[in-house]
């Protein structure tokens, strides 16, 4: 009885909030946690049309070019920790999402997907004879997977602690009725990757409590030809101790 009462009060509170601030704002509050700090890392600003759209570690004549899509918290310049996971012969470009760091815009599924596509096509244009691959962590696997719909597809995907469908993960943390009401940006990686025939490597973390490893396993099971690797640690531990090596092939 007490649980029912608490649930009822919670739902009534949410409905009141919907009327006050709208579902889109609540969705942003639940999904996106941007920071807006200056870049104090050794990463170099990545500039397109006079705007900083991310940060990079560039090498001369790279063997591969990687577009990295980070998770839902922090900002692109925080991701210096990921650079040692890449080959020293590859260039790495870490996209800044709209509304994150010093980039203008509002975080949403649509703005993330659009920014990812623009950045990817910009890299294709900049490096026309070099393989362009995509690596993503956590929520970044959503906009990353959307790139599989392009005509000129990525040469490889590496998805780290990804989800299969965002709604399924959200329902593990919040009541299902709340998710159905507010989750408009429901990335479906299973659907997005269903017709992709290229290389896909998927890393799931055994002790992940944010996106439990079963979601990485479910995604791998539905994507023909994908390679599943299970690593130790939790959601944010994948870059430790060489657990993930990001390579092509």
Cite the ranges covered by each PLM segment:
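An N-terminal hydrophobic leader/cap segment in hydrolases
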Residues: 9-56
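Membrane-embedded segments
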Residues: 53-122, 142
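Gly/Ala-rich beta-loop-alpha elbow adjacent to hydrolase catalytic centers
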Residues: 135-140, 144
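Active-site nucleophile loop of the alpha/beta-hydrolase fold
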Residues: 158-168, 188-189, 233
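Short beta-strand/loop motif that positions the catalytic acidic residue
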Residues: 196-197, 201-204, 208
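Conserved alpha/beta-hydrolase "acid-adjacent" motif
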Residues: 209-215
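Catalytic histidine-centered segment of alpha/beta-hydrolase-like enzymes
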Residues: 234-244
């Amino acid at each position: 009885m007490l649980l029912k009462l608490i649930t009822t009060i919670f739902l009534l509170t949410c409905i009141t909030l919907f009327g006050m601030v709208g579902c889109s704002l609540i969705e942003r509050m639940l999904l996106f946690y941007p920071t807006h700090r200056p870049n104090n890392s050794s990463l170099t600003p990545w500039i397109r049309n006079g705007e900083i759209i991310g940060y990079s570690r560039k090498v001369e004549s790279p063997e591969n070019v990687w577009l990295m899509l980070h998770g839902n918290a922090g900002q692109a310049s925080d991701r210096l920790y990921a650079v040692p996971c890449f080959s020293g012969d590859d260039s790495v470009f870490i996209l800044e999402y709209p509304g994150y760091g010093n980039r203008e815009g509002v975080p949403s599924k649509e703005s993330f997907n659009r920014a990812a596509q623009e950045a990817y096509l910009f890299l294709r244009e900049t490096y026309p004879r070099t393989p362009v691959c995509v690596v993503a962590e956590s929520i970044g696997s959503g906009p990353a997977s959307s790139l599989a719909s392009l005509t000129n597809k990525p040469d490889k995907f590496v998805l780290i602690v990804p989800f299969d469908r965002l709604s399924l993960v959200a329902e593990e943390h919040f009541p299902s009725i709340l998710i159905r009401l507010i989750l408009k940006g429901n990335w479906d990686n299973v659907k997005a990757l269903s017709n992709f025939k290229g290389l896909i490597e998927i890393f799931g973390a055994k002790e992940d409590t944010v996106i439990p490893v079963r979601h990485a396993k479910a995604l791998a099971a539905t994507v023909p030809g994908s390679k599943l690797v299970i690593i130790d640690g939790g959601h944010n531990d994948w870059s430790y101790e060489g657990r993930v090596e990001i390579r092509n092939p």
